[in-house]
């Protein structure tokens, strides 16, 4: 289930810095939009736009690859775990550069971390095939013209419900409601997902999961490849 985690929100807000106007691209239901900033949201899904809470930032129907704004319209552009959904990643990044006059902030994920995830390694190996070809952090930085990268370890009790949020709470993945908030489960073949969940349930009941991953239960947070990327726009 997806909801804003205040610790992650604080990291994103700090990365935005002293800007005033922000465009949130692939904004979804509006999580992580700083309430103290003048935010405009772009979201292509009518379903997600309808889920935005009352009083949320105004939202425009649009795609990252064709942002309906003039050049340099905002102090900053941001995207939170949405860039991997874009049809044309490099074009979307170019559009962020076009409309942002000062800063670009992405909360994203490094595909090279796949091997660090017990969920993908042991149960969802097919996820690797869903990663767009050429989607790497290096390519992202090149397309943005550089930037700094900040690791974002995920706390064991993360409020948000993205793919790796439950790394220390494996039974959560057995809940269909939890899985419904994670896009990967909808993209994978349903038989593959069912088999993975059956195996996970069996491994949890037998103690096999804890035998393989018990050291994780002692950790407060874990680096699973989530990153904040900050690019200062040079004009």
Regions of interest found by a model, annotated:
Residues 2-20:
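Conserved alpha-helix/loop element of class I SAM-dependent methyltransferases that forms part
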Residues 19, 74-75, 101:
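Local beta-strand N-terminus motif with an aromatic residue
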Residues 21-67, 91:
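Class I SAM-dependent methyltransferase SAM/SAH-binding core
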Residues 65-76:
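A short acidic, Gly/Pro-enriched loop at the edge of an enzyme's catalytic core
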Residues 76-90, 110:
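A short SAM/SAH-binding and catalytic strip from SAM-dependent methyltransferases
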Residues 90-104:
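A short glycine-rich, Lys/Arg-flanked "PGG" loop and its adjoining helix->strand segment in the class I
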Residues 103-137, 157-164:
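Conserved class I S-adenosyl-L-methionine
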Residues 149-235:
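Conserved Class I S-adenosyl-L-methionine
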């Amino acid at each position: 289930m997806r909801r804003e985690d205040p610790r992650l929100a604080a990291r994103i807000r700090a990365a935005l810095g002293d800007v005033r106007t922000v465009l949130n691209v692939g904004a979804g239901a509006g999580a992580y939009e700083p309430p103290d900033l003048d935010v405009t949201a772009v979201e292509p899904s009518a379903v997600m736009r309808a889920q935005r809470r009352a009083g949320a930032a105004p939202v425009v129907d649009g795609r990252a690859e064709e942002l309906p704004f003039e050049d340099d319209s905002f102090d900053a552009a941001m995207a939170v775990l949405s860039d991997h959904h874009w049809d044309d990643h490099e074009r979307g990044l170019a559009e962020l550069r076009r409309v942002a006059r000062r800063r670009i902030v992405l909360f994203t994920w490094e595909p090279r971390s796949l091997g660090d995830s017990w969920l993908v390694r042991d149960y969802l190996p097919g996820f690797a095939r869903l990663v767009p070809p050429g989607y790497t952090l290096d390519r992202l930085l090149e397309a943005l013209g550089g930037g700094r990268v900040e690791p974002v370890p995920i706390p064991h009790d993360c409020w948000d419900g993205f793919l790796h949020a439950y790394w220390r709470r494996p039974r959560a993945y057995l809940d269909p409601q939890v899985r419904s908030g994670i896009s990967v489960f909808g993209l994978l073949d349903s038989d593959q997902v069912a088999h993975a969940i059956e195996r996970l349930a069996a491994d949890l009941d037998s103690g096999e999961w804890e035998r393989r991953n018990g050291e994780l239960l002692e950790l407060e947070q874990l680096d699973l490849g989530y990153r904040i990327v900050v690019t200062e726009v040079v004009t």
